[in-house]
């Protein structure tokens, strides 16, 4: 019997069930413990990045090769002949999908991954980020990192700090964790960057408890996971940014009363919202989180391309 992810488009984290999320996390752990370079042998995966990327692209391409696949593609779509000749995205997808077994794509346009899935001739499309919309593989590595450090995905106290309005990673992670039981969220952000109403409405409908705070110091002792994000300078004038930035910088001193199991996560790149003295604490986990991205993407690719898993 094929797993439910076999040949499935991975466009939005909301379209994955709790059971599918658990299967990906479990498979990532198995591949971390016991690498398997034969899982997608003879499969070719397109890695098509229509906007520049470093971490996501390298992570996907490493994952593909570690489980036996081959990669074709590009990392700056604006410089390809596709763009220079004015080919539509739909036609580009039709052409590229005729060469490959799966299609990993990042695109600056919201909804581009959904569009690609409609023109890929049945080839599964994996969304590696479409504008400010979705970035499901980041959420998968976040879930795996949480499970690795906490041993569970339920009964967690999780704070999201910084830019909660525009940060697609926090939207998707909140949606994913809402599928699990008895998780409690703390939203810490300036009013101008608060979690969007539609996310809060989804959480209300799901019965998920959450609280809103303007500073993080008071919530840190309550947490299992502290998920930091960058407050983007371009959203504020200079004086307002200086004030807001200083309120959302995590230092080692902030962690003095933290639970022993607390882990600090960050989708990276960080700028100055986590000081380097945090790196030396046992709570820092953001660089291990990056490594976990390879295992999570190995698991995702293996399940999408291997019927027997």
Curated annotation (Swiss-Prot):
Keywords on record: Pyrimidine biosynthesis, Transferase
Entry keyword annotation includes Transferase: yes
Positions annotated to bind carbamoyl phosphate: 55-56, 106, 135, 138, 268-269
A GO molecular-function descriptor: amino acid binding
Catalyzed reactions per annotation: carbamoyl phosphate + L-aspartate = N-carbamoyl-L-aspartate + phosphate + H(+)
One Pfam assignment: OTCace
GO CC list: cytosol
NCBIfam families: asp_carb_tr, PRK00856.1
The protein's role, per its UniProt record: Catalyzes the condensation of carbamoyl phosphate and aspartate to form carbamoyl aspartate and inorganic phosphate, the committed step in the de novo pyrimidine nucleotide biosynthesis pathway.
Family: Belongs to the aspartate/ornithine carbamoyltransferase superfamily. ATCase family.
Entry protein name: Aspartate carbamoyltransferase catalytic subunit
Organism: Vibrio cholerae serotype O1 (strain ATCC 39541 / Classical Ogawa 395 / O395)
Gene name tied to this protein: pyrB
């Amino acid at each position: 019997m094929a797993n439910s992810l076999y040949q499935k488009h991975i466009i939005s984290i909301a379209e994955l069930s709790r059971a599918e999320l658990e299967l990906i996390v479990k498979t990532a752990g198995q591949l971390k413990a016991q690498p398997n370079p034969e899982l997608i042998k003879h499969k070719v995966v397109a890695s098509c990045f229509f906007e520049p990327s470093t971490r996501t692209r390298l992570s996907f391409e490493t994952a593909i090769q570690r489980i036996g696949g081959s990669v074709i593609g590009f990392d700056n779509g604006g410089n390809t002949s596709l763009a220079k000749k004015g080919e539509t995205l739909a036609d580009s997808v039709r052409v590229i999908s005729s060469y490959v077994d799966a299609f990993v794509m990042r695109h600056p346009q919201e909804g581009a991954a959904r569009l690609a899935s409609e023109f890929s001739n049945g080839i599964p499309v994996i969304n590696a980020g479409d504008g400010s919309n979705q970035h499901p593989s980041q959420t998968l590595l976040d879930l795996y990192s949480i499970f690795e450090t906490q041993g569970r995905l339920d009964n967690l106290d999780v704070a999201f700090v910084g830019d909660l309005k525009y940060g697609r990673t926090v939207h998707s992670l909140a949606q994913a964790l809402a599928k699990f039981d008895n998780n409690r969220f703390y939203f810490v952000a300036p009013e101008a960057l608060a979690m969007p109403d539609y996310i809060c409405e989804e959480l209300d409908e799901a019965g998920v408890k959450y609280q809103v705070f303007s500073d993080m110091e008071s919530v840190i002792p309550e947490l299992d996971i502290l998920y930091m994000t960058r407050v983007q300078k371009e959203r504020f004038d200079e004086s307002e940014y200086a004030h807001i930035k200083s309120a959302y910088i995590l230092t080692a001193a902030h962690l003095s009363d933290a639970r022993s199991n607390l882990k600090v996560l960050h989708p990276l790149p960080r700028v100055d919202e986590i000081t380097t003295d945090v790196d030396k604490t046992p709570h820092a986990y953001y660089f291990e989180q990056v490594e976990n991205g390879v295992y999570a993407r190995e698991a995702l690719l293996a399940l999408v391309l291997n019927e027997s898993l």
